[in-house]
């Protein structure tokens, strides 16, 4: 029985899953919108939302905690300086998932995950 077991396995090892979520979080912070499979997007959502909630506080302890999760200094700077201030008054729900059909090769469900009040001109700019 799987009682109180959170998260999805995504058919990868735990270290692969942690690295994948960290890399996807960096991509989402950098581009503010990414395209991925629906289960990965659903796993990324609580991961990135906890990071943004921490980044709203913006002190040294938070910076070190976020840096231990995503390992990219430029993404951490953007997360704390830009996204933390952008969502300072929002109590949660910083991302949205938009279903985008199915992938041609294997019919995997595809989705976009993006920030709610995203800057459309921020594609790839840190």
UniProtKB/Swiss-Prot annotation:
The keyword Ribosomal protein applies. Keywords: Ribonucleoprotein, Ribosomal protein. InterPro entries: Ribosomal_bL17, Ribosomal_bL17_CS, Ribosomal_bL17_sf. Signal peptide: none annotated. GO terms for molecular function: structural constituent of ribosome. One of its GO terms (biological process) is translation. GO terms for cellular component: cytosolic large ribosomal subunit. It holds the Pfam family Ribosomal_L17. Part of the 50S ribosomal subunit. Contacts protein L32. Belongs to the bacterial ribosomal protein bL17 family. PANTHER family: LARGE RIBOSOMAL SUBUNIT PROTEIN BL17M, RIBOSOMAL PROTEIN L17. This is Large ribosomal subunit protein bL17. It comes from Rickettsia felis (strain ATCC VR-1525 / URRWXCal2) (Rickettsia azadi).
